[in-house]
C-alpha cells in the first residue's frame, strides 16, 4: 500500500524566479514491519542583478527516508504448522515464541519483537554565479560551488523475550550504526566567444576544478 503527495509552487518576475517543490510518500509492504516514509523538497531560483552584470542561480535539495525493514522469512512461514498459533495471550509479549528449533520458528514473533529503524538523509545545496563582463562582449566568468551531505543511521534492538536472545541466553542486545559522507565541489572558469566575418569564431575557456570528499562511520 502506498500514498504520495506532491506540492509545487512557482513565482517570479523578469529579474527573479523561484520554483519550489515538496513531496511526502509512504509505502507499506504486505509483510509485517515492512514500511518506508520519504519526504523532501527542492528550491531553485534565478536572479539577475546589477543591470544583468551578475546572474545568481541557487538550488537546495533535501530528502529523508525512514525505513522499517525486517525481511521476514516467507518460506519459513509456509513451512510452519498452520494449527500452531503464533499468538499466546498468556505470555508477556502476546506472542508464542518457539525456541530451540532452528527450522521451525514463529516468524510473526521474530518480526514484531525486533525494533528496526533506519534513517537516510540527503542534503545538497549548490549555487551558480555568472559574471557578465559587459564592456567586453562575449566574456564572462562562471563559478559553481556545491556541497553534498549524506547520512545513514541504523537502530536495532532485540529484547530479552526475542527468540534469538532466549536461544543464546542473553538479556537482549542493541546495534547502532552511523555513516556520513560529505562532498565539496568548486569550479570556476572564464569563457570568451567572438564571431568574425566569414563565419569564423573564437571560443576560449580557462578555469579550475576542485573536489573534496570526507566521511566517517561506526558500527
Regions found by a protein language model. Name each.
Residues 116-147:
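Charge-patterned, long linear interaction tracts outside catalytic cores
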Residues 41-43, 143, 186:
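Extended, hydrophobic alpha-helical segments in both membrane/secreted and soluble proteins
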Residues 148, 166-167:
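Glycine-centered small-residue hotspots that permit tight backbone geometry or close packing
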Residues 2-23, 27-34, 40-122, 154, ...:
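Flexible loop and strand-edge segments within Gram-negative outer membrane beta-barrel domains
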Residues 46, 126-130, 187-191:
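Short, acidic/charged, Gly/Pro-enriched secondary-structure junctions
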Amino acid at each position: 500500500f502506498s500514498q504520495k503527495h506532491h506540492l509545487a509552487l512557482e513565482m517570479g518576475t523578469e529579474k527573479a524566479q523561484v520554483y519550489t517543490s515538496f513531496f511526502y510518500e509512504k509505502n507499506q509492504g504486505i509483510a509485517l514491519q515492512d514500511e518506508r516514509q520519504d519526504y523532501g523538497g527542492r528550491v531553485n531560483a534565478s536572479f539577475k542583478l546589477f543591470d544583468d552584470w551578475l546572474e545568481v542561480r541557487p538550488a537546495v535539495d533535501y530528502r529523508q527516508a525512514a525505513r522499517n525493514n525486517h525481511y521476514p522469512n516467507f518460506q519459513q512461514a509456509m513451512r510452519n504448522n498452520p494449527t500452531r498459533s503464533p499468538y499466546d495471550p498468556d505470555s508477556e509479549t502476546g506472542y508464542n515464541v518457539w525456541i530451540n528449533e532452528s527450522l521451525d520458528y514463529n516468524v510473526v514473533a521474530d518480526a514484531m519483537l525486533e525494533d528496526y529503524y533506519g534513517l537516510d538523509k540527503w542534503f545538497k545545496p549548490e549555487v551558480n554565479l555568472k559574471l557578465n563582463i559587459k564592456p567586453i562582449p562575449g566574456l564572462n566568468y562562471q563559478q559553481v560551488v556545491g556541497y553534498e551531505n549524506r547520512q545513514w543511521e541504523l537502530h536495532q534492538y532485540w529484547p530479552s523475550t526475542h527468540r534469538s536472545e532466549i536461544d543464546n541466553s542473553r538479556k537482549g542486545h542493541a546495534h547502532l550504526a552511523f555513516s556520513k559522507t560529505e562532498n565539496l565541489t568548486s569550479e570556476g572558469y572564464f569563457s570568451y566567444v567572438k564571431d568574425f566575418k566569414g563565419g569564423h569564431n573564437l571560443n576560449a575557456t580557462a578555469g579550475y576544478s576542485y573536489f573534496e570528499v570526507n566521511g566517517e562511520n561506526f558500527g
